[in-house]
């Protein structure tokens, strides 16, 4: 609460501020990032956190590099990989919707998050959008994505982050030549070895979106998620939907950003 901005004259009672999943009940006035309907009617949930758990989870193997005859060799380490993990559970009891948010920090510094939506009420619950985000500081003023076509894929393009929303959508059922692997926000003129950079990636081989957005009262926000068609995800009572992982990286230049993924 100490980080929330003060109330602005002539605006809402609470000044909008980006979170990992901002909703209208938090005074978010940007693009909708959590869209659900019950029996055809859209719900605007006011979630209350019911549980937070921090733990270290054994998650796969750690690989150690050795050099033999001048060539690197990768071997499984004796100790399993341990990943710091935070799991938060929130619920809107009145509207019958539960949300479980999970965030992991890899040993490289890569952050990844996902959310699970659970229908705890009566009637069918249609999930239209769950777009998770990473708030970024004020020095992130320039957007970098890639575009292209056959024989000219992954061509970089830049533009300033202005008030409003920029999004890069992949709607061909898999990442196409036009798809961007990362959406990066950084200091103006950032490069491979200079400038603070913050990047996001949706770990999904289907339809997806990456976005950058800034409101008049806030700093910027990176976001991403799966693009769902109407009726594609409909939950009966007790059923759940889990989003793809949305990965976030940062660094002094793009090389450091990439190193956290690799």
Predicted segments with their positions:
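Functionally constrained cores in energy, signaling, and assembly domains
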Residues: 113, 226, 248-251
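Short, acidic Gly/Pro/Ser/Thr-rich loop/turn segments
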Residues: 207, 250-251, 255
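Short acidic, Pro/Gly- and aromatic-enriched capping/linker segments at domain boundaries
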Residues: 216-236
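An acidic-aromatic substrate-binding cleft motif
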Residues: 242, 256-262
